[in-house]
């Protein structure tokens, strides 16, 4: 008799499926999230793995790159940044006219290219203007021999200039370099205008007190056309006392308009070359009248009886 051998296989031990699936999921998750974490780290540091220079997704480069400076000290600004600077400096200049940084910012942000191009054409059409653009002189205490100016006769431009500097306690070195005008030559033209400002005070005798500054600004605007000067003449008097506005509107504005419109272009004056010239002769040649002494008018106002000098400065 044959023994019957069971065909049933022997029982095998089945592994727990969870013991395989769970570690696999953990490993897969670790791989995925580890990669995501590394990617996030690179995104945070600005270093993604797109190294193809032709790739449009290469974010190693900044999202927006600033233009390269066109000259030493130049700070390129886009249109929105210039608009913000103009708005902020306008408010700052009105509230704090003594703060030079607001005046500087307002001047450069409103020095529109068409205005400077017009001045450029004006200079290029004049022999002296062309010489200034070619040589690009700077008005500083180093370029001007201040001790020599003190030795000049009292009736000369150089003597009037140094006397005005000493009387007002200012220096030619107080004019900061232009930074926010993009074109190099236009930046120099504005720098030249800025550095010549004290000569306009000197030939007119106007002091640096607020009324004198406003009067010179109106003269500059009517002759040179710098927008900031016009804005100063328009809005600065609003902060003055009634008597100060009366002096400006009644005496110095008519003088500034007449002299500015009748005078030859002040931007074409090579001041460094005419320091020994008679100042009265210069005024006649240019067509500039000397205004009344502002400080003397203020002194007379203060000597008036109290009811008559009400609101005087």
Curated annotation (Swiss-Prot):
Function (record text): Lyase that catalyzes the C1-decarboxylation of 4-hydroxy-3-methoxy-5-(all-trans-polyprenyl)benzoic acid into 2-methoxy-6-(all-trans-polyprenyl)phenol during ubiquinone biosynthesis.
Organism of origin: Meyerozyma guilliermondii (strain ATCC 6260 / CBS 566 / DSM 6381 / JCM 1539 / NBRC 10279 / NRRL Y-324) (Yeast)
Subunit and interaction comment: Component of a multi-subunit COQ enzyme complex, composed of at least COQ3, COQ4, COQ5, COQ6, COQ7 and COQ9.
Biased composition (Basic and acidic residues): 303-313
Catalytic activity from the UniProt record: a 4-hydroxy-3-methoxy-5-(all-trans-polyprenyl)benzoate + H(+) = a 2-methoxy-6-(all-trans-polyprenyl)phenol + CO2
Membrane topology classification: Peripheral membrane protein
Keyword Mitochondrion listed: yes
Enzyme kind, highest EC tier: lyase
Additional free-text comment from the UniProt record: This protein may be expected to contain an N-terminal transit peptide but none has been predicted.
Segments for region (Disordered): 290-313
InterPro entries: Coq4, Coq4_euk
Documented EC number(s): 4.1.1.130
Domain of life: Eukaryota
Pfam families in the record: Coq4
Pathway(s) the chain acts in: Cofactor biosynthesis; ubiquinone biosynthesis
Compartments (UniProt record): Mitochondrion inner membrane
Binding site for Zn(2+): 197-198, 201, 213
Name of the protein: Ubiquinone biosynthesis protein COQ4, mitochondrial
One Gene Ontology term from the biological process aspect of the record: ubiquinone biosynthetic process
Gene Ontology CC, one term: extrinsic component of mitochondrial inner membrane
UniProt keywords, alphabetically: Lyase, Membrane, Metal-binding, Mitochondrion, Mitochondrion inner membrane, Ubiquinone biosynthesis, Zinc
């Amino acid at each position: 008799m044959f023994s019957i051998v069971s065909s049933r296989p022997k029982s095998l031990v089945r592994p727990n499926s969870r013991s395989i699936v769970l570690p696999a999921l953990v490993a897969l998750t670790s791989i995925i999230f580890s990669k995501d974490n590394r990617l996030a780290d690179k995104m945070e540091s600005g270093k993604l793995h797109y190294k193809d220079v032709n790739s449009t997704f290469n974010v190693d480069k900044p999202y927006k790159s600033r233009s390269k400076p066109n000259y030493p000290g130049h700070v390129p600004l886009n249109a929105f940044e210039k608009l913000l600077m103009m708005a902020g400096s306008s408010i700052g200049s009105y509230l704090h006219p003594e703060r030079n940084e607001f005046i500087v910012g307002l001047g450069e942000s409103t020095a529109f290219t068409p205005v400077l191009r017009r001045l450029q054409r004006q200079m290029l059409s004049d022999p002296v203007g062309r010489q200034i653009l070619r040589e690009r002189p700077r008005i500083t205490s180093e370029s001007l021999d201040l001790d020599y100016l003190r030795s000049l006769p009292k009736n000369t431009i150089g003597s009037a200039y140094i006397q005005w500097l000493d009387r007002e306690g200012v220096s030619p070195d107080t004019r900061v370099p232009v930074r926010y005008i993009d074109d190099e030559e236009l930046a120099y033209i504005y720098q030249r205008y800025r550095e010549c400002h004290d000569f306009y005070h000197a030939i007119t005798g106007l002091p640096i007190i607020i009324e004198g500054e406003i009067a010179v600004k109106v003269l500059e605007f009517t002759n040179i056309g710098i927008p900031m000067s016009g804005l100063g003449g328009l809005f600065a008097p609003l902060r003055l006392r009634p008597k100060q506005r009366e002096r400006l509107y009644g005496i110095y504005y008519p003088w500034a308009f007449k002299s500015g419109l009748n005078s030859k272009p002040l931007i074409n004056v090579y001041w460094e070359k005419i320091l020994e010239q008679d100042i009265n002769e210069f005024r006649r040649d240019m067509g500039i009248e000397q205004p009344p002494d502002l400080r003397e008018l203020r002194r007379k106002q203060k000597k008036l009886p109290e009811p008559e000098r009400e609101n005087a400065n």
